[in-house]
Every structure is written in C-alpha cells, then in structure tokens.
C-alpha cells in the first residue's frame, strides 16, 4: 500500500470538509459497494460524520467484531438505533457509526478517522477505488475537485 497517496487523500479530504457549508453533504464510497463515510455540514453546530454500519451493508460485506472494534478504536461512536425506528430519541444518534463534531471542527482529524475507516475497515486498497457524491439539502450537486476523486455517476 502506498501510504503517500492515502496521506494526500487525507489532506485533500480535510480541505474539502472545510469547504462544506451548512446543509451540504459529502459521501465517499468504494465504487460498486455500499461501504461509505459521509459528512453533513451543520454550520455553527459543527459537522456530523457517519460510517456505514451493518444496517446498510449486504450480507457478504457485513462487519465482523474485529471491524466493529477497529471503528471504535478509530474514534467512531457505535450505532444507537435501527434505521426504521421512529419516535423521540436523543439528538445525535444514528443507525450508522457516527461522530458529531462541534465547531470549530478539526477537519484534518476527521479526515484521518474517515480515511482510516475506508482503508482499515472497509478494505479500500487505492484511492482510485473511491468515488464521491456531494449535494445540498435542495439536491443541487456540488463538485469537490480538490479531492482528486471521480464523482459518482448519478
């Protein structure tokens, strides 16, 4: 594995996260899979980040106990509820692994945690396997050329 290309992606992702405004979303995934990390700009509140849990992974790609432990070691919080659960619950929970980072957000650290999940948990071998989607709350597409990744085909 070429550590320099992952360091570059981590740096570039940190820059992209710093450009993510309130009501904007960025999803990085391994092409052809549902293995992802995603970010939601929350303005003055900070940023919500999520990493795919078994709720969203097909049977053959589900995370084992070692992967669960690795996500926790990286700094992710464990999922708090099932996707279909409704009703009141504590703000900040998620059916995915997640982090709610208050402002000011340490974008470099968040990028490091996210890339760590893509590589050491979800199995990305090369950044060229990754693609991204970015959009606003209204559904408008956003481009992040700083990432050096291909946008996902719509």
Positions of the model-derived regions?
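Acidic, proline/glycine-rich low-complexity IDRs
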Residues: 1-6, 10, 89-154
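Extracellular, modular beta-sheet/disulfide-rich ectodomains of secreted and cell-surface proteins
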Residues: 2-3, 7-11, 15-40, 50-51, ...
């Amino acid at each position: 594995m070429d550590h320099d290309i992952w360091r570059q992606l981590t740096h570039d992702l940190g820059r992209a996260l710093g450009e993510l405004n309130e009501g904007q979303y960025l999803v990085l995934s391994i092409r052809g899979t549902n293995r992802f990390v995603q970010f939601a700009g929350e303005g003055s509140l900070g940023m919500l980040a999520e990493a795919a849990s078994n709720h969203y992974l097909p049977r053959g790609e589900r995370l084992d106990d070692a992967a669960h432990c690795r996500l926790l070691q990286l700094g992710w919080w464990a999922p708090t509820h099932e996707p279909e659960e409704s009703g009141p619950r504590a703000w900040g929970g998620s059916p995915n692994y997640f982090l709610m980072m208050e402002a000011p957000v340490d974008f470099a650290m968040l990028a490091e945690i996210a890339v760590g999940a893509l590589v050491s948990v979800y199995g990305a071998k090369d950044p060229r396997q990754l693609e991204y989607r970015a959009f606003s709350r209204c559904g408008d597409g956003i481009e992040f050329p700083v990432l050096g990744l291909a946008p996902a085909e719509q």
